[in-house]
Amino acid sequence: MNKTKGFTKYKKMRYIPGLDGLRAIAVLGIIIYHLNKQWLTGGFLGVDTFFVISGYLITSLLLKEYDDTGIIKLKSFWIRRLKRLLPAVIVLLMVVGTATLLLKSDNIIRVKHDIIAAIFYVSNWWYIAKDVNYFEQFSFMPLKHLWSLAIEEQFYIFFPVILVTLLLTIKKRYKIGFIFWGVSIISLGLMMFIYSINGDHSRVYFGTDTRLQTLLLGVILAFLWPPFKLKNDPPKVVKYVIDSIGSLSFIVLILLFFIINDETNWIYDGGFYLISILTLFIIASVVHPSTWIAKIFSNPVLVFIGKRSYSLYLWHFAVISFVHSYYVDGQIPVYVYFIDISLTIIFAELSYRFIETPFRKEGIKALNWRPSYIPQFIRMAIVVTLLIPFMLILVGAFNKYGKDIIGEKANSFDTTIEDNYLMRIAPIDNIHIDGLVSEKKKESSDVYNNIKPLLIGDSVMVDIGESFKSSVPKSRIDGKVGRQLYQTLPLVKANYSQYKKSSDQVVLELGTNGDFTVKQLDDLLNQFGKAKIYLVNTRVPRIYEANVNRLLADAAKRKSNVTLIDWYKRSQGHSEYFAPDGVHLEYKGVLALKDEILKALKKK
């Protein structure tokens, strides 16, 4: 190509409305999933759709610039990205920080830390470091969804540099494509390897290294199918093939939105890769200028939503987190969802019109202190008003209203507890949760010194730990928030292998955080030999509740040394037992569950 580098005029790539239509489908799936998982169990796959689109579109823009000018102006690219993404995020962070201070002040430290991570676009690594479960919706974390933006921004920072280097050193583009394909396979392998080691969904879900596979598939498509080189009038048979493959892929993707859930293990063993390939086929058909599927995705309603997909994504989760925190999860009235949707639309539209669009077009000039420029002046006044409490939050001026660490060393418990990120261990003395100090409440004076059971469980066990220990001083309690049944066998082998005699009593309260198989349950039960085992079933507003309770009941029928403690039945109709998440226990719930367990243990 004969051109002087940097001087040939760059022609802007044509607008592709079908991609906005696809963005609309993706963001609607995500919003529905976060409103209520049971409505669209695989809606979280919309994030992967965004990743593939981002990889494809960014690479296409960069390749177009390189083909037109012989150079890629990295500084200009990064400035455009910042103008497009950063202002709306900063406003979201300021609003969420201020709202947390006013409405949820006991969470201010947690949210402050999340804000700092979001500012530097490292939210995903922050949540990995704090062992946060993405699919766990029991805690108030209104910025947790920013993990995906962190991955995209990290991609925007490093990928262009790598692309420019490869373009300047390797002349054959198919070789560059093979390099990116190889890296995507490595990323896929990392996800499969890490998941096989510890079965940790969140590590592989949040990790830039493990999610890079999806972005790079979009990159590869840009090399194979650049939108600026597609012909307007291909042969009819070609259009038919493109439309057929794209339509079939879209139908399968939508079916997966309904079929897959966060407990579907195969998606971590290559599933995300295959699903992203489906998205590639959809994109390939949508960006072609002559296909009918492109016309369908260019529907004005879908395009309208798609153009606002960034703002909708930013605001929906924060709105849902605040609104739902005042209701019991699983018992949310229908009108609350209308409130969620209405507030999301309002905030997203305000953000799109008055933050996202002006800053994208004008940059810092979108702010102005001169009253004659009314929109800019109002925008500036609002930003400054929010900025004052925001900066005070960041410097820790309001830390006194929230607590970051709870629990103390007590008796035989390991009580190094981080409340904010779901790492509580059952304490005995004072409990500090989200800034609230809960002194021991006066309970029944009955003390049972003649039994010494082992209790293993998740966050519900943590909730009853203090109360149960006061009634059964010789009990041994091991509760950890987020624990799942499949994670418990190594713990038992390492620490509790002595509980195998027929005189031993073992209480297992597991199932709050996810499903398990018959084999996983039996392997755990068999580890306790002849001990009397008591299985506490669960009440959790999640799709796996019924199956968990069925497996526990079946085990009690199959094994003579296993007894079912029917917490599901005992708690039926007692919303006063539960915190707003519908799972964790208020004081009355603590006493009720303790009573159920004690009744079973006293029968021996």
From Swiss-Prot:
Compartments, as annotated in UniProt: Cell membrane
Organism domain of life: Bacteria
UniProt-annotated catalytic positions: 459, 581, 584
Entry annotated with the keyword Transmembrane: yes
Pfam hit, one: Acyl_transf_3
Main localization of the protein described in the UniProt heading: membrane
Protein family according to the UniProt entry: Belongs to the acyltransferase 3 family.
Protein name, entry field: Putative O-acetyltransferase SACOL0978
